[in-house]
Curated annotation (Swiss-Prot):
PANTHER family: GUANIDINOACETATE N-METHYLTRANSFERASE (PTHR32379:SF1)
UniProt-recorded name of the protein: Protein arginine N-methyltransferase 2
Gene expressing this chain: rmt2
Annotated family: Belongs to the class I-like SAM-binding methyltransferase superfamily. RMT2 methyltransferase family.
Purpose of the protein: S-adenosyl-L-methionine-dependent protein-arginine N-methyltransferase that methylates the delta-nitrogen atom of arginine residues to form N5-methylarginine (type IV) in target proteins. Monomethylates ribosomal protein L12.
Length: 424
């Protein structure tokens, strides 16, 4: 077993060192004693080594990495079987340690100095059981935070003083994610924010819906950027948009609505399916102007709605408009906005046998975040009365795509294309 703590410096606080060592040795009883007896500020389950950035979760999982000597001798003179048994036992003890740390409030997506979360390490080492444990912890944390987002904090000062809890309690860093406002539902996580702060360019201004709508956009052949160089839409998404349009519109003559025109990629493919009616909701005035310049308002069946979907859709519902297909691809909106869209608006706009989809970029700048948000959205869709099917599409290598873009919003290998419909 490799020693994940071998590089610990002598300047590490003794208590921190003991906690991290106990985590790496999967010594749960000792961990429990150390954590319960800790009298320092902060959660001891989230202490960090200053030289590696390891938290106890990182240390517990990294301890399962085989050392070089063990790797070299595997398969020689029948040693594979014993090594495999030893590794299974090691992973099992790690699982117990991870379970305990999560129960104590360990942050599932904390970043080390190698820009890895505990789940990233588990995935890199092929430790599926541990990876799934971290994913499930992320799902629980995100579901909780999303629910808390819907509650107003107590405004009674006396209540706050009596309980010792005010808004700070709701702001504990128990979990991720980003918000970069979700460009095309690309969520920015707390982990990503830390990474941005460590970069040479810095994190830059927050991406909010109001800032985006007030910004000047730059249109080129292969990308659409806002004034902060955030990628609003890029040409590499073309295959995804083509497949989405064909899945939503398997036949001609259907009624469709797209929310978020951007570069017009998906709307172009929708036109190829010869819809009977093609409604487009677009909030940014620069995009609307570009649409008119390109003659979108003159295309067959096209109706352009200028404004935010939050203002447009209720009016369409009141008018009795319905659609066979709906696509959602907005920029700089939060997951809460998206949840409101499918929970409150789709039900009044989609035909009973209709289909709808969305650009699935939530957490796509880190595989574990992408996996977490797939489960989160599945649960929320189920609660709203929708079934969802996923189709995996291989994403091409994008190394050269991000030149001139503030940050890559896509790093995972496969895109999961969603197709949603009402439950039977």
């Amino acid at each position: 077993m490799a020693d994940p703590l071998a590089d610990f410096g002598s300047n590490v606080d003794l208590t921190v060192q003991e906690i991290l060592l106990a985590a790496s040795q999967h010594d749960v009883p000792k961990l429990r004693r150390l954590i319960r007896s800790n009298d320092k500020d902060g959660n001891p389950a989230n202490v960090k080594d200053p030289e590696t950035g390891f938290s106890p979760l990182h240390a517990a999982i990294a301890a399962c990495e085989p050392d070089e000597a063990q790797t070299e001798t595997n398969g020689v003179n029948g040693e594979t079987s014993s090594a495999s048994t030893e590794q299974k036992s090691l992973v099992q003890s790690a699982a117990e340690t991870v379970k305990y740390l999560l129960q104590e409030g360990a942050i599932w997506n904390d970043l080390d100095l190698n820009d890895e979360t505990p789940g990233c390490i588990a995935r890199r080492l092929g430790l599926t059981e541990l990876y799934e444990m971290i994913v499930d912890a992320g799902v629980r944390a995100e579901l909780l935070l999303n629910r808390l987002d819907g509650y107003e904090p107590l405004s009674d000062d006396e209540d706050d003083q009596e309980t010792g809890q005010g808004e700070d309690a709701a702001n504990e860093p128990a979990a991720e994610e980003d918000q970069d406002g979700a460009p095309e539902l690309v969520e920015t996580t707390a982990a990503d924010a830390s990474a941005a702060e460590a970069s040479t360019e810095g994190p830059g201004p927050d991406v909010t819906s109001s800032r985006y709508l007030d910004s000047n956009l730059t249109f080129t052949n292969d990308r659409l950027l806002d004034q902060d160089q955030n990628g609003v839409m890029m040409a590499w998404e073309t295959e995804i948009m083509s497949r989405s349009a064909k899945k939503l519109l398997p036949t001609t003559g259907l009624r469709v609505m797209n929310i978020g025109h951007g570069m017009g990629i998906v709307d172009g493919f929708i036109q190829e399916q010869s819809p009977a009616a093609h409604h487009i909701v677009e909030a940014h005035p620069d995009v609307v102007a570009e649409m008119k310049r390109k003659g979108w308002h003159e295309k067959p069946g096209v109706v352009i709605h200028e404004g935010r979907w939050q203002d447009i859709l209720p009016a369409l519902v009141a008018q009795g408009e319905t659609f066979d297909a709906i696509y959602y691809d907005t920029f700089a909106e939060s997951y809460a906005d998206f949840r409101e869209f499918f929970s409150e608006q789709v039900i009044g706009l989609l035909e009973q046998d209709g289909k709808w989809g969305f650009f699935n970029g939530m957490g796509a700048d880190r595989q574990i975040s992408y996996d977490v948000y797939q489960k989160v959205v599945e649960m929320d869709l189920f609660e709203a009365g929708f079934d969802v099917e996923w189709e995996e599409i291989k994403v091409p290598k994008l190394e050269g795509e991000w030149t001139g873009v503030r940050r890559p919003y896509w790093v995972v290998d496969n895109y999961r294309l969603p197709l949603c419909k009402f439950m039977d």
